[in-house]
Amino acid sequence: MTQMSVPFDEAARTIGRRCLCLRVQRASRAIGRQFDDAFRTIGLNNWQFSLLMNLNRPSPLTVTRLAEELAMDRTTTTKNLKPLERRGLVEIRRDDQDARVKRVILTEAGRALLTEAVQHWTVAQQKIEASLRGSDLASLHTALEAITQS
């Protein structure tokens, strides 16, 4: 086993400054907290908002497809859907052609809450974008998309 040629403290500082994983995780948590705060008054969190937004389409998604859209595993997606289902915001039904497949449907109550949530999202999004003044948001979006697609 070889020893590190860089002292640990120096390596830790370098990683702290340069590690994309660490920096993106920190930024994600900070942004997530801001959206959680924005949605709190309507009883949602940012993950639930993301689920509802992804279900707002003409045809219901399968649980597997929803998980893929959110870059989550199927089990975590199912777990995160349960509170929304209990609140009557989504329905999970067996597919008509294949009983092994489950489809997720946004209910009218879910659609109504989502409409309200979009207003809260808009305020939070504008606040976050304002905090990034001077940054090139288009480049940030492009870089994040490139990371997501790699």
Predicted features along the sequence, with ranges:
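Short hydrophobic/aromatic-rich motifs at helix boundaries and adjacent loops
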Residues: 4-10, 20-23, 34-36, 53, ...
